[in-house]
């Protein structure tokens, strides 16, 4: 019988099997470990060991004035990161300003694991407040302070103090699975539209790039107005911001106004939304006044969801260039769900079989497993487990506060999804 030698597993392999929260601690042990962990080889090795693991995420509301930062539902404790608590709990207390009231932190947007927050740091005069902006990864407690945008009104004697409501959204560039840069988009003025010229609307924005560390002004043209100052954050995917618009007095779904902030084009693309009550027909038809809609993403797809009288439909943007939508779900929901006050919130960031809804009549959050047509009612701060042992946290009281005045329109909540690797926050050159 052949006798074999006992094989020892290299230290690097042992380390790569740990969750990212544990690996992050080893980076500070010594320069050698830091160099090993930040290498491409180690990142690929970690990915091979955790290929079937999920990552943590939260469905977030964009913070409204005098409200606290709120998530509707979140999953944590996954094997990739092994977090003991929800993602939003890592944002506050904010390490840069730990003693500020929670109502003075504004969640603006998220993209590929990075979040943008504005912090109200002081009152200047005449009820004008001073804000600071930060982009970072709250779990790693790694933040980059963003300089203030330049004053667009150079001849104005009064300085320009951008408010959190001028923040439109954030986009990122991913190379080889790692976030290499980000851009932040602010509107120049609250009216958003400066003028209408030859049938085209002019949208003036100020864009910050982590590649240069500078804000630059940009003019973008669109055949429909860009309402970037709405309560919700625009949906972002692959460098593109998707914003919503609809003609006044219309009950139809409206259109998406999309722009690629990493592209060279200065034109927005207008994409008609599918669903009940076409924009140009039955504009005063009350039959569809209780249609509830949301725009979300799942995987690499933009998803549009519509609920009317317990019938849920979901479409995938099949081809952005041709503006084609593909119907992927049509499901009749059970009778215990409200027939007129059920609002779709979002789709699972990784699974198009799972959707999340808010039942305003009963004040509860509902998850729907569409393939099995099973719907589950969740209670406040419920802790549940998935097949992988992920922890679920539901915030019904916070969601109720944000949803109590919702009626029509297209809801767009922000998906804060941790990456499958602990990318460093892109920083501008010195």
Swiss-Prot record:
Residues 1-45 form the F-box domain. SUPFAM superfamilies: F-box domain (SSF81383). CDD domains: F-box_AtFBW1-like. InterPro entries: At3g26010-like_b-prop, F-box-like_dom_sf, F-box_dom, SCF_F-box_component. This is F-box protein At1g49990. It comes from Arabidopsis thaliana. The lineage of its organism: Eukaryota, Viridiplantae, Streptophyta, Embryophyta, Tracheophyta.
């Amino acid at each position: 019988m052949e006798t074999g030698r006992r094989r020892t597993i290299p230290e690097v392999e042992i380390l790569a099997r740990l969750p990212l929260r544990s690996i992050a601690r080893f980076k500070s042990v010594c320069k050698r470990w830091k160099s090993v962990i930040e290498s491409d080889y180690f990142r690929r090795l970690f990915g091979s060991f955790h290929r079937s693991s999920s990552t943590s995420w939260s469905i977030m509301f964009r913070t409204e004035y005098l409200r606290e930062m709120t998530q509707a539902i979140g999953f944590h404790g996954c094997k990739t990161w092994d977090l003991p608590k929800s993602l939003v709990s890592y944002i506050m207390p904010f390490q840069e300003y730990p003693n500020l009231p929670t109502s003075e932190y504004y969640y603006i947007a998220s993209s590929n694991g990075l979040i943008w927050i504005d912090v109200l740091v002081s009152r200047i005069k005449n009820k004008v407040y001073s804000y600071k902006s930060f982009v970072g990864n709250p779990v790693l407690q790694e933040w980059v302070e963003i300089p203030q945008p330049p004053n667009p009104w150079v001849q104005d004697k009064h300085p320009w103090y951008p408010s959190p409501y001028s923040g439109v959204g954030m986009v990122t560039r991913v190379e080889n699975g790692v976030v290499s840069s980000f851009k932040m988009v602010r509107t120049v003025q609250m009216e958003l539209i400066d003028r209408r010229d030859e049938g085209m609307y002019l949208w003036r924005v100020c864009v910050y790039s982590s590649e240069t560390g500078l804000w630059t002004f940009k003019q973008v043209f669109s055949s429909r107005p860009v309402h970037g100052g709405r309560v919700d954050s625009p949906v972002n995917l692959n460098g593109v911001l998707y914003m919503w618009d609809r003609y006044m007095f219309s009950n139809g779904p409206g259109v998406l106004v999309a722009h690629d902030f990493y592209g060279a084009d200065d034109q927005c693309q207008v994409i008609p939304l599918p669903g009940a009550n076409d924009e140009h027909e039955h504009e005063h038809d009350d039959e569809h006044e209780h249609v509830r809609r949301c725009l979300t993403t799942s995987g690499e797809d933009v998803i549009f969801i519509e609920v009317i009288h317990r019938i849920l439909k979901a479409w995938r943007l099949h081809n952005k260039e041709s503006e084609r939508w593909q119907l992927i779900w049509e499901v009749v929901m059970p009778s215990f769900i409200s027939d007129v006050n059920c609002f779709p919130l979002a789709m699972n960031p990784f699974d198009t079989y799972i959707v999340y809804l808010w039942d305003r009549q009963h004040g509860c959050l509902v998850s729907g497993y569409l393939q099995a047509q099973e719907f589950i009612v969740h209670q406040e701060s419920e802790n549940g487990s998935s097949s992988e042992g992920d922890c679920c946290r539901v915030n019904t009281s916070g969601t109720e506060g944000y949803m109590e005045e919702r009626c029509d329109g297209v809801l767009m909540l922000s998906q804060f999804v941790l990456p499958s690797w602990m990318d460093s926050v892109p920083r501008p050159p010195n």
